[in-house]
Amino acid sequence: MTTNYIFVTGGVVSSLGKGIAAASLAAILEARGLNVTMMKLDPYINVDPGTMSPIQHGEVFVTEDGAETDLDLGHYERFIRTKMSRRNNFTTGRIYSDVLRKERRGDYLGATVQVIPHITNAIKERIVAGGEGHDVVLVEIGGTVGDIESLPFLEAIRQLAVDIGREHALFMHLTLVPYMAAAGEVKTKPTQHSVKELLSIGIQPDILICRSDRAVPANERAKIALFCNVAEKAVISLKDVDSIYKIPGLLKSQGLDDYICKRFSLNVPEANLSEWEQVIYEEANPAGEVTIGMVGKYIELPDAYKSVIEALKHGGLKNRVTVNIKLIDSQDVETRGVEILKDLDAILIPGGFGYRGVEGKIATARFARENNIPYLGICLGMQVALIEFARNVVGMENANSTEFVPDCKYPVVALITEWRDEDGNVEVRTEKSDLGGTMRLGAQACQVSEDSLVRKMYGSTTITERHRHRYEVNNMLLKQIEAAGLRIAGRSGDDQLVEIIEVPNHPWFVACQFHPEFTSTPRDGHPLFAGFVKAASEYQKRQAK
């Protein structure tokens, strides 16, 4: 089957939810038996988001092959079964870097290197490579139509639609249709102007997704269709909903997938959305609720922990409970004390970098351990739990990580200095190495101890999880820590690195070096998060007695 492309753009304002809308459409097409993948093209100059501040950009989503990507790829994986890879996300910076490298090598044979055709050709090549082997590819263009940064991408997809034939390309434009309370009606003019901007670039949208806080009336959709030169049945109303998992059904009810399949001449079965209906039912009919405190340093922007937040919700679905997440700044724990952690049913410390707020996280881990509160530590959350145990149980005064105190007496967490690249070559890295692209990244095998709590949750002694870190447990001090009672519940496939720790005399204290949140989905959940939320429910019941 020839690969078909749906190019997704956004207009009027940012943060309309292009990623969610595109992923929801992909879920419907997948439910019709099509092999679907998605791509995100980001117009910023950074080569990837790996070194960008989470407060500015949100979380960095790590793929199985170790790419540091936009958080939208997390949405994609939560909505469709296809696993994303480094082919599914690239930036302006990556494109320019590749083109300039070719220019330095002389690949362009002395030609003047320009945005058109060299940059646009590079973009097209990456899109085609990312879509190979799939029936339908949804390509989301970051930013808003009208932004200078997006122009090379828009020109590239305009050209690509011509190259592959318009019978295999659709342009879907997401736009805002605001409701004006004073007039008592929605306004279509912003949408008309946004489409006009697209037309000036040479792109005629085939589908318009109209975002609004309410359903856009049929007469207004007809008006939009007339003035934007779009088929009336291709003007879709996408109102605000209380659950993003209702969006696939909302789009399907308006015949969006039928319209697309007809345009692409795809003779496929009707979509079966029963799995999504089950998710919606579980979300709407909880048997209880728990409150979980998440102690971090980027809490002013919840998107910095997007996958963790979603994974906690998925854990709630698997236990039929609503998970109320209380975001707590770790610096507040330092200044106000652990009293602010009271009345929580469980505590989670997610990943992070840098010393700010670390002592608050260490105090949090101690509070959870000493008060038998369920604890899940992820990445840095495992490292602070280890530091706390070393200080207060083993007796290693001022134990720390060399990330925070390079010359500390007890460096229980230290930099991994020898790494193997994707070709198997040994590469030495130090504190002076570049920050970008120099971490242990992607899916890594882990051997789980038979007698561990984690073994019961996973149901297996061999698991694979995604990583993003450059510091690890210092094996030189491990014997003393184990002798004091800490259980090493999981190690890397080569038995060299500690992956999971547990406190055996605690009802539920688990910490892992990997990031389980990246593989959690609403339909399948994740063993660790399901077990963690279950432990929170059980703790709540014990406290109520």
Swiss-Prot record:
CDD domains registered for this protein in UniProt: CTPS_N, GATase1_CTP_Synthase
Cellular component, GO, one term: cytosol
Chain positions recorded as ATP binding sites: 15-20, 72, 239-241
Binding residues annotated for Mg(2+), in chain numbering: 72, 140
Spans annotated as Amidoligase domain: 1-266
Residues that coordinate or bind CTP: 14, 147-149, 187-192, 223
GO molecular function: ATP binding; CTP synthase activity; glutaminase activity; identical protein binding; metal ion binding
A matching Pfam family: CTP_synth_N
Stored PANTHER family: CTP SYNTHASE, CTP SYNTHASE-RELATED
Note: CTPSs have evolved a hybrid strategy for distinguishing between UTP and CTP. The overlapping regions of the product feedback inhibitory and substrate sites recognize a common feature in both compounds, the triphosphate moiety. To differentiate isosteric substrate and product pyrimidine rings, an additional pocket far from the expected kinase/ligase catalytic site, specifically recognizes the cytosine and ribose portions of the product inhibitor.
Quaternary context: Homotetramer.
Protein name: CTP synthase
Species: Enterobacter sp. (strain 638)
Source taxonomy: Bacteria, Pseudomonadati, Pseudomonadota, Gammaproteobacteria, Enterobacterales
